[in-house]
Amino acid sequence: MLDVIVVGAGPAGLTAALYAARAGKSVLVLEENAAGGQINYSPLVENYPGLPALPGAQLGETLAQQAQDLGAQLDWRQVTGLTPLDPGFRLDTDCGPLECRAVVIATGVTHRP
């Protein structure tokens, strides 16, 4: 059983994964699209603390790489359900179920024009 599954690989999800991995937890990040989430659609991110201005897609790649460097795993799946267990949780995905001790929901937002 994994320690933590993070649903969503945007900046919030990847940051959660990074900190959980740094704490020595086994971490899996599930994302159905590209790592970085909505930040990928930003041509230039100029206000991310500690980093110079860079394209949004590059920031997403950087965050994903940092989390992976610390031991987090990324997998491309769609989560279709979440069930509490005793202990932990079961996540149903398009590739089958997964179990974990803790889950972080960081699914972000939907772009509105």
PLM features: residue spans?
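FAD-binding core/adjacent interface of flavoenzyme oxidoreductases
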Residues: 1-7, 23, 74-113
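Glycine-rich FAD pyrophosphate-binding loop
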Residues: 5, 21-41
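Glycine-rich NAD(P) Rossmann-fold beta1-alpha1 loop
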Residues: 10
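N-terminal Rossmann-fold NAD(P) dinucleotide-binding loop
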Residues: 13-14
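Alpha/beta-hydrolase active-site loop signature
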Residues: 34, 43-46, 111
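N-terminal Rossmann-like dinucleotide/flavin-binding domain of flavoprotein oxidoreductases
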Residues: 40-97
